[in-house]
Amino acid sequence: MHKKVLVCLPLNDAHRAALEASVPEFEFRFNALDDVHAEDVLWADVVLGNAPVSMIRQNKHIEWFQSNSAGPDAYLKPGVLPENCMVTNATGAYGLAISEWMLAMWLGIQKDMFLYRDRQNQRQWAPIDLSLIH
């Protein structure tokens, strides 16, 4: 089964090669998200990544659209995708990264790391009187 896949995701060469090797019978085009062309979207049977809605709307034969965000709401509006198009998204893909970031920010605030960072950037090595802050 031959499918044409447009990939609008920031992939490195190794990831591109792995994707192509996983389904050698598929034909791939790789575009940066800021360099997606209507002709590529119209060519594709499958779109991986958030190509512009205005371009997606023109393709009446897309079989699968994979959003690289958790909320593909703009693509779910009537008339954007064909009725039989499968839509998947990245729900849950960022959970660990977001929770790690939240923990890091909380620790930074609790330990006044941002105050120390600002002082260090200003080359001020005097202690900070934290009793005035807390």
Tell me the role of every PLM-derived stretch.
Residues 1-88:
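An N-terminal-biased, well-structured beta-alpha scaffold segment characteristic
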Residues 65, 133-134:
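Single conserved hydrophobic/aromatic residue that forms the stacking wall/gate
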Residues 83-133:
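Phosphate-binding beta-alpha-beta segment of Rossmann-like dinucleotide-binding domains, i.e.
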Residues 16, 29, 57, 117-119, ...:
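Arginine residue identity/basic-tract feature
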